[in-house]
Amino acid sequence: MTDLPAQICSAMSTLEFVDRSYPMLSSWGVRDEDVLVHSLGCSAWNELGSELGYMAVAECPVPMTHGADIRADSTWFSRTQRTPDVLIEFERFDGTDRGQKKLDEKLCNLLEASMRWGDAPSVLILSAWNKGVVSAPNKEVFALRCRQGFKSSVGAQVPSLRNTAVLFSRFIFEIECSGTLLLKQMRCERLL
């Protein structure tokens, strides 16, 4: 049996995978227009899922058990179990308190989505991207959220995680003189 979180962190801690799969992010340069960076980042995550043997789906809706619409940016389905094994949210982070709150909301989406899938996913990934130098997100807040659970906006109790790995990934872009963004650093670490 393979250590899936370690495989993911290995692939998403260097630029090698992205250089090979999505050079627009790391060597061609990309403009920060509309949702282009988001689309490319989600595509990169889907590509990694495919390379690791999963059926990767973009914007996959989770079962509607509590009334709120949630779609993970990338969902990796096990081809043998036919259930989601990995859920990913990819979000811009600007280094502000508002940005931290947005990442926390995305983490809550992952936790609730996992619950709605019957706790089938073995890995949840919160992936943030930023341009230029910004303050680092407070990862302790994320770990605490996973350990304590929360009450959703519609009143559903989302329990703490058990037997699920949580990874935090960062795509760090530099702003070039031309105004384009180039991915210069990637980080991936296990929170739980």
Regions found by a protein language model. Name each.
Residues 75-87, 117:
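Active-site beta-strand-loop-beta-strand hairpin of nuclease catalytic cores
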Residues 36, 40, 44, 67-69, ...:
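Short, well-structured alpha-helical interface segments that form or flank functional binding sites
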Residues 1-63:
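Acidic-basic catalytic patches of nuclease active cores, encompassing PD-(D/E)XK
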Residues 126-192:
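Domain-level recognition of nuclease-like catalytic cores that cleave nucleotide substrates
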Residues 73-76, 110:
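Core alpha/beta structural scaffold of self-assembling particle/tube/pore-forming proteins
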Residues 93-150:
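Catalytic cores of nucleic-acid endonucleases
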Residues 12, 16, 41-53, 111-117, ...:
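Hydrophobic, Leu/Ile/Phe/Ala-enriched alpha-helical segments that form helix-helix packing faces
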Residues 55-69, 82-102:
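Acidic/glycine-enriched edge-of-secondary-structure segments
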